[in-house]
């Protein structure tokens, strides 16, 4: 493993660019390139699914206790032809006070022909003053599958009535020829939270890009999240490219349960088999 260039100071935040490359070889998907540095850490690879022994699962961890003011974190992920890969987080990521600079997390994903890629994050926990911007871009081959999930939950550890500053998310998904399939963007401030979400304090999205015959029933995806006590709504993605699920929950634990359940429905539809539980 090589560590990328990193700048790190309490006043400026940290800037790091990381990369992961997954290929299929010898009947398994394998991590061919790993370029990761502090504060990110990637576990060893796991093969958790007897029904899909080729599927590689990695856990992405934060070694620093969360995201801090001024952090600029980037990750480039490539999943080669025929590979199957799931990148998830070990636990929720705490987002600290942005102090007027906030944190930015960038993700770029390339999924080649016949490949399966899932990138599912536990909710970002927004502490008072937190400001986080997510910027994600993906390129997905016509017969490939991409599942992406992320969201946030609000937490005021000292119960002083303080809220986060802002959470924003932008996602663009294209075909290899550059054709835009989907563009999704949202922004919410702590001041507007109650007006926008009502009694809910956590929200997330799941996007599944897949050929039509590899999509689960919309109702099944929605009901999986609802059974956890969340409020979910699913619909077709633009350009007949897949499905989009929106989820609201009262807290981060309920949201995590709902998103995990929805992921397993999405993965079963895309792969044709049920995946094992990802222990955290």
Swiss-Prot record:
Belongs to the UreD family. Keywords: Chaperone, Cytoplasm, Nickel insertion. It is found in: Cytoplasm. It comes from the Bacteria. Its main location: cytoplasm. GO terms for cellular component: cytoplasm. UreD, UreF and UreG form a complex that acts as a GTP-hydrolysis-dependent molecular chaperone, activating the urease apoprotein by helping to assemble the nickel containing metallocenter of UreC. The UreE protein probably delivers the nickel. InterPro entries: UreD (IPR002669). It holds the Pfam family UreD. The keyword Transmembrane helix does not apply. PANTHER family: UREASE ACCESSORY PROTEIN D. Required for maturation of urease via the functional incorporation of the urease nickel metallocenter. This is Urease accessory protein UreD 1. It comes from Bradyrhizobium sp. (strain BTAi1 / ATCC BAA-1182).
């Amino acid at each position: 493993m090589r560590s990328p260039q990193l700048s790190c100071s309490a006043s400026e935040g940290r800037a790091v660019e990381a990369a992961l490359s997954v290929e299929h070889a010898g009947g398994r998907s394998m991590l061919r390139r790993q370029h990761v540095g502090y504060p990110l850490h990637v576990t060893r690879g796991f093969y958790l699914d007897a029904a899909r022994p080729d599927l590689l699962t990695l856990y992405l961890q934060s070694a620093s206790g969360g995201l801090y003011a001024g952090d600029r974190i980037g990750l480039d992920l490539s999943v080669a032809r025929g590979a199957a890969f799931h990148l998830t987080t070990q636990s929720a990521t705490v987002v600290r006070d942005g102090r007027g600079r906030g944190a930015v997390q960038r993700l770029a994903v390339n999924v080649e022909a016949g490949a399966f890629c899932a990138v599912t994050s536990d909710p970002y926990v927004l502490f008072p003053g937190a400001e986080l911007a997510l910027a994600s871009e993906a390129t997905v081959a016509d017969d490939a599958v991409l599942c992406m999930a992320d969201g946030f939950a609000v937490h005021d550890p000292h119960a002083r009535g303080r809220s986060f500053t802002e959470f924003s998310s932008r996602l663009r998904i294209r075909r290899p020829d550059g054709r835009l399939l989907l563009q999704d963007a949202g922004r919410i401030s702590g001041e507007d939270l109650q007006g926008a979400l009502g009694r809910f304090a956590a929200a997330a999205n799941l996007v599944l890009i897949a050929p039509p015959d590899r999509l689960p029933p919309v109702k099944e995806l929605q009901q999986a999240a609802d059974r956890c006590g969340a409020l979910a709504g699913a619909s077709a993605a633009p350009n007949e490219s897949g499905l989009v699920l929106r989820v609201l929950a009262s807290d981060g634990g309920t949201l995590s349960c709902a998103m995990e359940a929805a992921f397993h429905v999405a993965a079963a539809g895309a792969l044709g088999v049920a995946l094992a539980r990802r222990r955290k």
